[in-house]
Amino acid sequence: MASLPVNKIIPSSTTLLSSSNNNRRRNNSSIRCQKAVSPAAETAAVSPSVDAARLEPRVEERDGFWVLKEEFRSGINPAEKVKIEKDPMKLFIEDGISDLATLSMEEVDKSKHNKDDIDVRLKWLGLFHRRKHHYGRFMMRLKLPNGVTTSEQTRYLASVIKKYGKDGCADVTTRQNWQIRGVVLPDVPEIIKGLESVGLTSLQSGMDNVRNPVGNPLAGIDPHEIVDTRPFTNLISQFVTANSRGNLSITNLPRKWNPCVIGSHDLYEHPHINDLAYMPATKNGKFGFNLLVGGFFSIKRCEEAIPLDAWVSAEDVVPVCKAMLEAFRDLGFRGNRQKCRMMWLIDELGMEAFRGEVEKRMPEQVLERASSEELVQKDWERREYLGVHPQKQQGLSFVGLHIPVGRLQADEMEELARIADVYGSGELRLTVEQNIIIPNVENSKIDSLLNEPLLKERYSPEPPILMKGLVACTGSQFCGQAIIETKARALKVTEEVQRLVSVTRPVRMHWTGCPNSCGQVQVADIGFMGCMTRDENGKPCEGADVFVGGRIGSDSHLGDIYKKAVPCKDLVPVVAEILINQFGAVPREREEAE
């Protein structure tokens, strides 16, 4: 199947074929993960009558910044109050970060205003103060559309964390992104300049902003891709940050907002857990996308994305993104933070009314109905990308490397950059499973690449089968919201389970330190969500709620609770039991006896 070429962003037609003309609506039923919620999401296509007053925008533009109107400020959450006191983007637009960086942490803590700058507003610049566990240190999150980065960028990030010694490291995130750790405030202005010099930005990557646009990690090199997602994710990112200058029209959202563009039958991009997912589809011979909306995880509620009953052409990818963000900005809840994601707004308005609000914000105030000609083959078997695989370009291959729970040190990043230069084209690609792909490797160089010490000793293209699908959030080592330590524990538990049972196929296991579910446990075959519990002696200890049954792909499904509040020290036999009973694992002792 031919794909849309990278240099042809907006095709007038396409020869791509749909796998069938089935009804393309997903099942609107949703799996709740903590508390029961309104059934509105299940009947979203049936809109209640909406009072005209409810559709009055709650924000207005003042001096270039979008602010909440006075009449809508009753009952707002603390984050909204911080935004009203001073727009966080002023730290960037008016270079407030330079003045802030001259203050000691002691000086910062003397003023509520400065503390709010450090602990809240800096998140608009991608800086997260780790006050609880690493006082005075920051995590910095970037924008990396489609997960594509370069050896030069990787070296620069390595140079930043290297100076921080044991406090410095980097993580690959579940949105194909980099997070670097150990940053101190006085260094921030120079780091921001350094990012700009290598074509990177951290702008608008935290809090109530559009998060990193996810795309196919094999975009442009996959022999079976539907469309090259890189042009679209790049356009979305450029719009969101106004080419790294700051797009003030969408920096005061009610809550974060996650987009993705689907380019493969494999659905590597996980469309069902995004606020907006672009699903490839043709209509009247023209290439475009059907839209799914509202997928999200939170402490209170988890929902799969549902159809908007809308199709846009390739040239309307950014306009519909803009229209939806403006509708969310104008009408979304700003009270309880657990009820501020976009799906709550869809619930209240009903899908048709929400769709109408998006439509009237389109350039021509027209939003076409969904196409029946979806291009994703629903019976497609998801392919493995770890290891060596041929590209669509003759004589070239890509090599997928396993990065254990996504954690890297400076010297390892430098080595990866060197390897990308020596064996590939200087490009690296990050995946939502926290791994890295080296594309454009000449086939004649494959053997030499596989013999590199880094691949032999650390980042294997052929990891143990249970390690392949292992994902873990930051955990309590660095994150103040995490209840338990995750990364080291995920590796340790998996290693111990591997000694007990033998499995014949990968099993995706995800760890998250708290109910915010940054580790996306609900999409895993087996998921672990951190909690506090009690051991056999009644003493408090770290534990995990165990989820089972998450599915990805066209038959997506959010997992269900299997067992609550299991002490972490007791997880190994529980996991082994699940693997034997539900995934065909065999106890090692029986395997050896046979």
From Swiss-Prot:
Binds 1 siroheme per subunit. One of its GO terms (biological process) is nitrate assimilation. [4Fe-4S] cluster binds at C473, C479, C514, C518. Induction: By nitrate. It catalyses: 6 oxidized [2Fe-2S]-[ferredoxin] + NH4(+) + 2 H2O = nitrite + 6 reduced [2Fe-2S]-[ferredoxin] + 8 H(+). Monomer. This is Ferredoxin--nitrite reductase, chloroplastic.
